Amino acid sequence: MASTRSIELEHFEERDKRPRPGSRRGAPSSSGGSSSSGPKGNGLIPSPAHSAHCSFYRTRTLQALSSEKKAKKARFYRNGDRYFKGLVFAISSDRFRSFDALLMELTRSLSDNVNLPQGVRTIYTIDGSRKVTSLDELLEGESYVCASNEPFRKVDYTKNINPNWSVNIKGGTARALAAPSSVKSEVKESKDFIKPKLVTVIRSGVKPRKAVRILLNKKTAHSFEQVLTDITEAIKLDSGVVKRLCTLDGKQVTCLQDFFGDDDVFIACGPEKFRYAQDDFVLDHSECRVLKSSYSRSSAVKYSGSKSPGPSRRSKSPASVKRGGHHASAYSAARSPVNGTPSSQLSTPKSTKSSSSSPTSPGSFRGLKQISAHGRSSSNVNGGPELARCLSPEGVNGNRCSESSTLLEKYKIGKVIGDGNFAVVKECMDRSTGKEFALKIIDKAKCCGKEHLIENEVSILRRVKHPNIIMLVEEMETATELFLVMELVKGGDLFDAITSSTKYTERDGSAMVYNLANALRYLHGLSIVHRDIKPENLLVCEYPDGTKSLKLGDFGLATVVEGPLYTVCGTPTYVAPEIIAETGYGLKVDIWAAGVITYILLCGFPPFRSENNLQEDLFDQILAGKLEFPAPYWDNITDSAKELISQMLQVNVEARCTAGEILSHPWVSDDASQENNMQAEVTGKLKQHFNNALPKQNSTTTGVSVIMNTALDKEGQIFCSKHCQDSSRPGMELTSPVPPSASAEEPPVSAPAAAPAPLESPTPPGTPAASGCERAGTWRRHRD
């Protein structure tokens, strides 16, 4: 500011010293005197606008100014990703003040746990000849490649630049350039189904529910993704963006044409893990009455083709109805007590799919044709003829699939025990040994464009084999589906082990921590970080001799650590401070989550929580790392346990202990824990603070839900951090201190559940027999 003023003063001093040769316009010049021509001769000082210094600004026309402000459009690709079609960014000085700001935005848009896990750090030209180091080097209409710290990978990135919007277009840049008119006509024909239509979208959650009316026509419905964006802006879900739309019959909307069918009312759900309750698809009498009056008023303009450019018009009615309202649903769920949604868990909602998939739904798996999903229908619960046809030796289109034939020969396939967004789980029994497993069937057509996420998860499962980790027994593949034979754990999760037992001591908690630390030491030895350690992913395995152990599952967010990671993901209650701070993190984020779990095991509530259910408050507490052991809940807990928790919950990553140090700590290894029964106290607090700690009717469903999840279900858990959270951007919603409803798998019941009898689950291969000191009902401590 001071330099600017000094320049202005120097300018005026120069004007005083050197008068302009000409006087005011229309005044005659004087040959001999300077009294009339000089600026001071007539006592007038010319305006700065007339000075030579300001003549520069007069030459900059409005056209020049507008061209300077105009945004440059450029397309960005991921380094080495030949299946990514690129993302177009509008780059302007107003949007990006610096080159680092552009890198940060590209990281949020292009980075995930497989591609660019360390964020975007380098931008190459499309041919890799040079690096881009400033915003001025980016040119209008050019393409660039984003990388972390790795060298440029030479791939023909522009090969798949034109997406196949129509199933009749075979794609390819060459054909698009050769016959643009034909492609354009085909695209136009594919949208002939679009007619002006007024639809009602109801937000999921507790009643009364907000509803909005949206006009769909050729001006407002360009693509399915664009309509979802408009619905997100209109309905404003508490949990962020709208990820899923269903009709009142429970059928999922998968493409743009589904909006123009017989259905007029849709249910909108966000990225939270949510299983639909039966009454979510049923409108009460007041909602039907309000909707009827609303539609009677709007029927005259329903097909008039409004000229308003806006995509939606809000309705003050709480809900809407569909054709008089006959809706049936067989879905059941446990809904979070806060706003009716399990907000903290950020997985894609679990919905039961319709038995017939939409014929207009686009889908391909690396060029393979899509076929209808098998085994989804409720009439085929035993996996009979349909599964046999799916796994028949003839395969698909007459091609033999020896893998599927081998699968049927080796295993007896039973009924469906779990149905998720991208996978279905069936009972599976080894014909030779009689051991029970879970068969996870992933539909490749539903993973189109995101196959790398599934491949990453499966590649990690192939590598790990440990008694405290749910094991991938076998994998097989056909042209349309991926089959994973998984270890089936029937004992429920960590909370079930506490709430369903008659006695729970500090020693039991110590054994649970030992099991978890044992699994983490193994994973970290392979440089694998789990990133989603929480009680819902820790399943209880009960052995024939009555002993128990924990098994870690759900590797959807797991990845191999080759350097600092920057993807902000996880579950708020268990997320480490370095993830929130976005300073880069590694293996020890799992240790922090284990420390939070250890704290909960001994008192029943988390160490960091927001009394006002605000995510910002929770993150501030985690970043501060102020750990307290309030009385009277911690009065009877040993100092050794408190010491270990303090070492695990160190904000300083270097000071935080490792998994090996946890195993060697006296509280874990030397039986420094007490035998006092604290089952009633801990169970009471768990039921108060965690909705998934309520007793379940069937503990097997907990293990099935963990197996049913895929890496694609985890996309919603990559969230906006504390630094980028605002009211207009979807972020991670918090239910504090209630963590995620990992378990909205079973509806809560009021009657207390009896302690389950030990299950005759088979002992996994390689599991050592229980030592003599491990009596029935105690926890096993597997020694590596």
UniProtKB/Swiss-Prot annotation:
ATP binds at residues 417-425, 440. The modification Phosphothreonine is found at residues 61, 683. It comes from the Eukaryota. PANTHER family: SERINE/THREONINE-PROTEIN KINASE (PTHR24347). Autophosphorylated. Protein kinase with a significantly reduced Ca(2+)/CAM affinity and dependence compared to other members of the CaMK family. May play a role in the down-regulation of CRE-dependent gene activation probably by phosphorylation of the CREB coactivator CRTC2/TORC2 and the resulting retention of TORC2 in the cytoplasm. It comes from Ailuropoda melanoleuca (Giant panda). One of its GO terms (biological process) is intracellular signal transduction. The keyword ATP-binding applies. The modification Phosphoserine is found at residues 379, 664. Belongs to the protein kinase superfamily. CAMK Ser/Thr protein kinase family. CaMK subfamily. Residues 72-158, 197-280 form the Doublecortin domain. It is found in: Cytoplasm, Cytoskeleton. It catalyses: L-seryl-[protein] + ATP = O-phospho-L-seryl-[protein] + ADP + H(+); L-threonyl-[protein] + ATP = O-phospho-L-threonyl-[protein] + ADP + H(+). The gene is DCLK2. This is Serine/threonine-protein kinase DCLK2. Keywords: ATP-binding, Cytoplasm, Cytoskeleton, Kinase, Nucleotide-binding, Phosphoprotein, Repeat, Serine/threonine-protein kinase, Transferase.
